[in-house]
Amino acid sequence: MKTFDGRALATSSNEALRTRLEQNTADGLITAPVVIAQGLSDIVVPPSATDAYVEERCSAGQRLEYWTFAGRDHFTIVQPGAPLEELLIRWTMARFANEPQASGCVHKSF
């Protein structure tokens, strides 16, 4: 993990933080509907880290939707009016309407 100036945040010199970040990873199957959104220009949570997490979760049998957004970063992905806003509202409304989530792992690019 890196900070905005490029220095690593979770380094061996910050072992307590690195250990806590590793512990703070969901590794059990989640029975509720799951969607993960990732800005492809994100430098706070790099897309490669989310890709690896999604791949690991899918290999473990987790059902989820993984949405990636070109040109969006950690902050612009959630700005009012960003594409995620309407997509997430529609996705959530569908879940409350008891419409099933897509089966397996589905990756959509926006």
What are these regions (language model features)?
Residues 1-27:
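Accessory cap/linker subdomain of secreted extracellular hydrolases
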Residues 10-14, 27, 43, 47, ...:
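Solvent-exposed, acidic/flexible segments
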Residues 18-19, 51-110:
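C-terminal catalytic histidine-bearing segment of alpha/beta-hydrolase fold enzymes
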Residues 25, 34, 79:
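Solvent-exposed, flexible loop/coil residues
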Residues 27-30, 59-61:
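A structural signal for short secondary-structure junctions
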Residues 30, 35-42:
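Short beta-strand/loop motif that positions the catalytic acidic residue
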Residues 32-34, 46-56:
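Short alpha-helix in the alpha/beta-hydrolase fold that links the catalytic acid
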Residues 40-45, 75:
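Acidic catalytic loop of the alpha/beta-hydrolase fold
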